[in-house]
């Protein structure tokens, strides 16, 4: 029997945030990362920058053709408008843009917008439906609100820096500006929640207050409940996952692997794979509590086995045993990994400076309305005339 003809392909869906206009007044990381995320899913993001200097991120880290390559990621899908917000004319124009916007993103010190005549009360008189995201070091209220705060300080106050590094040593940085990015992601959640509320509950906007240290604190797991219930102050544990065993980094002849053998059945398979069935069969190691009590012995056994093998040999052996394990990737490893490419997590982006650069893809993956890179990062003021 002949099959019916295939149905024609469905037309592409509109972007999830198509029609949402965002005014981004933030700079560096926290505010702009939120704007970047909203822009990837279709929002029209208008970035207001100071004339002549622009966002300082344009000049951070490694520079190519006069601009940071980081800028090419952080500011894609945005339009740049040069305005001096310290001057009356710039403030007037900004208010006109905000009057027609859905979202305002800012990460100035509390009180800055108020000093420019752009308090929430004043802006909501202009635009009652405005969703206003305010990211700052300590929030818009409280005794610390006026203190200067960067992501690193938020990581310290939020409890993260105390847990990083080796026990008894200097607290170390995670390696990226995780405090700023966590604040941005919490802010993005707030924006999307407020937009939904506006749609289904009467059209009113609201203010979203995100403090850097609170965004970090919100992911500190059982830190406070353990202190409240037991008086336990969690300490740094190096590469290990404290209270869970075995879960650690182990040396190989050519690098490091992370092994998570902390499930009861996984632990037994792991011990068989490394030639230590005696540990896998030990009654007191059949559950996590017992394994934590002997974690140094277990880690030593795994490390002695892995240290005689390459990373790939370890991964092959543990993969065959169905034990979760992974190589510690460098940028080179990521750039050469076929899985990243298969999931469109490495994309080539043409810049306005005449060269192409590989950039991270878009997260999360939406089946019906996936994110896209519609435009490359703008030069300072590229869109001033068109927008105004």
Predicted regions and their residues:
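Glycine-rich beta-alpha junction loops
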Residues: 52, 138-139, 212-217, 254-256, ...
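Aromatic-enriched alpha-helical interface/lid elements that frame and gate functional surfaces
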Residues: 245-321, 325
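Oxidoreductase and adenylate-handling cofactor-binding alpha/beta cores
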Residues: 184-206, 218-229, 271-277
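Short Gly/Pro-enriched turn/cap motifs at secondary-structure boundaries
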Residues: 71, 237-242, 247-248, 354-357, ...
């Amino acid at each position: 029997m002949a099959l019916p003809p295939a149905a024609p392909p469905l037309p592409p869906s509109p972007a999830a945030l198509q029609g949402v206009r965002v005014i981004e007044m933030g700079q560096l990381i926290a505010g702009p990362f939120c704007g970047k995320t909203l822009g990837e899913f279709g929002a029209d993001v208008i970035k207001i920058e100071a004339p002549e200097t622009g966002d300082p991120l344009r000049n951070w880290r490694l520079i190519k053709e006069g601009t940071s390559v980081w800028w090419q990621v952080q500011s894609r899908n945005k339009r740049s408008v040069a305005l001096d917000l310290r001057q009356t004319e710039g403030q007037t124009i900004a208010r006109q843009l905000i009057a027609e916007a859905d979202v305002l993103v800012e990460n100035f010190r509390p009180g800055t917008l108020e000093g420019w005549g752009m308090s929430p009360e004043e802006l909501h008189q202009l635009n009652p439906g405005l969703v206003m995201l305010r990211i700052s070091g300590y929030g818009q209220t409280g005794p610390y609100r006026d203190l200067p705060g960067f992501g690193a300080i938020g990581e310290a106050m939020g409890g993260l820096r105390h847990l990083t590094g080796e026990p008894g040593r200097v607290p170390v940085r995670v390696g990226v500006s995780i405090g700023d990015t966590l604040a941005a992601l919490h802010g993005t959640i707030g924006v999307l929640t407020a937009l939904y509320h506006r749609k289904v509950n009467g059209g009113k906007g609201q203010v979203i207050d995100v403090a850097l240290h609170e965004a970090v604190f919100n992911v500190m797991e059982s830190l406070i409940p353990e202190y409240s219930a037991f008086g336990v102050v969690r300490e740094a544990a190096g590469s290990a996952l404290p209270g869970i065993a075995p879960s650690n980094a182990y040396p190989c002849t050519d690098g490091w692997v992370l092994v998570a053998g902390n499930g009861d059945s996984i632990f037994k398979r792991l011990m068989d794979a490394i030639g230590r069935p005696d540990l896998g069969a030990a009654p007191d190691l059949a559950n996590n509590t017992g394994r934590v009590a002997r974690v140094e012995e277990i880690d030593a056994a795994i490390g002695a086995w892995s240290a005689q093998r390459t990373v790939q040999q370890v991964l092959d052996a543990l993969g065959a045993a169905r034990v979760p394990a992974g190589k510690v990737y460098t940028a080179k490893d990521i750039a050469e990994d076929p899985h990243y490419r298969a999931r469109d997590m490495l994309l080539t982006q043409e810049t306005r400076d005449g060269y192409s650069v590989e950039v991270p893809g878009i997260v999360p993956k939406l089946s019906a309305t996936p994110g896209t890179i519609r435009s490359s990062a703008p030069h300072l003021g590229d869109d001033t005339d068109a927008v105004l």
